[in-house]
Amino acid sequence: MENKRIDTIESALEDIGQGKLVIVIDDEERENEGDFIAAADKVTTEMINFITKEARGLLCVAVTMDRAKELQLEPMVQRNTSQHETNFTVSVDAIAEGVTTGISVYDRAMTIKMLGDETSHADSFSRPGHIFPLRAMDGGVLRRVGHTEAAVDLARLAGCSPVGLLCEILHEDGSMARLADLMTIKEKFGLKLITIKDLVAFQMRRSKLVQRAVESNIPTAYGEFRLMAYESFTDQQNHMAFVKGDVSTDEPVLVRVHSQCATGDTFASLRCDCGNQLASALRMIEKEGRGVLVYLMQEGRGIGLINKLKAYNLQDDGFDTVEANEELGFKADLRDYGIGAQILQDLGVRKMRLMTNNPKKVVGLEGYGLEIVERVPLEIEPNAVNKTYLETKRDKMGHMISCSCGSGNH
């Protein structure tokens, strides 16, 4: 598709600020879905009527985590097993003059506008209802590359309340509208069409999730590195980057994005391969003479140390690593790579050879505009303790592991 058919973020923000709809897709290079997005506080009955006729999808409203707490919008389910981790809350209807069943165009428009009205409170809504709020991650598209976060970011950047209306666009036959369909809608109704990829780049230029606080030379058993410590504005953690050589050139850089594992990295636990992967990555960077290891404080694939140990207890009772997380009410992997991407951006990394076995990590980092020219395997020979763990990562989480772990029937 020609890029000239994709509108600028600035032009879309102008339209949103004027109370218009825009179409948002993931990336112009992909045959993916598109959503109508607008600022919730600019919604009209005419807009909702148009969306129900032309989009045919589910009317949702993206809110910040703080706004969800203010309005007491609790998660729809305690155990979210949705494929894309969409953070639905309980559905709502507005309690207001003229609102009856909640399903009419007027009723839904009122509910959406009131969700975007800062004077609304928890008692302004009945539950369940006909509008589905979604909780956006703090940090927006720089933390999660999704339409939910895009809706909040776009509303905020347009000078509106940071609450966004979004609705998937379906084809007339009920299937998902694809790129050609979305372009037809764009031209027919004179709407702006933008990509989340461009929004991420726009936010990368103007918003920072992390700030480099200090750096120092660190001699290690694997070699000498420059250690950069970063302060995070979203999770209040201190993250690190071990840097070898000049990584700010156009030549692809050997990179490892490693999440904290205190038990494996520090105490050499045999339950996982984390410590061995960390050591191997540092050795490979030292041998290369140039590279980066980003160390993110995302213990236990993002569930924290205490929950990780609870998961270990469940594994001792027969659960695998995925089942244990789900039994505790978590997804198999809660990590996000927005912070890691910003650290790499700060270091000047443009192209990378990424050391990972995890396809989600490749997709996650590419979503932030980083170019991965090669995936470098980082396989560790299993031991008697972690054999089943590695099989589960391969068979259930899609990790690209070719080691002799057995049949995987566990």
From Swiss-Prot:
The keyword RNA-binding does not apply. Keywords: GTP-binding, Hydrolase, Lyase, Magnesium, Manganese, Metal-binding, Multifunctional enzyme, Nucleotide-binding, Riboflavin biosynthesis, Zinc. It catalyses: D-ribulose 5-phosphate = (2S)-2-hydroxy-3-oxobutyl phosphate + formate + H(+); GTP + 4 H2O = 2,5-diamino-6-hydroxy-4-(5-phosphoribosylamino)-pyrimidine + formate + 2 phosphate + 3 H(+). SUPFAM superfamilies: RibA-like, YrdC/RibB. Pathway: Cofactor biosynthesis; riboflavin biosynthesis; 2-hydroxy-3-oxobutyl phosphate from D-ribulose 5-phosphate: step 1/1; Cofactor biosynthesis; riboflavin biosynthesis; 5-amino-6-(D-ribitylamino)uracil from GTP: step 1/4. Binds 2 divalent metal cations per subunit. Magnesium or manganese. Binds 1 zinc ion per subunit. D-ribulose 5-phosphate binds at R30, E31, D35, R144, V145, G146, H147, T148, E168. The active site is at D333, R335. Zn(2+) binds at C261, C272, C274. Pfam families: DHBP_synthase, GTP_cyclohydro2. This is Riboflavin biosynthesis protein RibBA. The lineage of its organism: Bacteria, Pseudomonadati, Chlorobiota, Chlorobiia, Chlorobiales. The gene is ribBA.
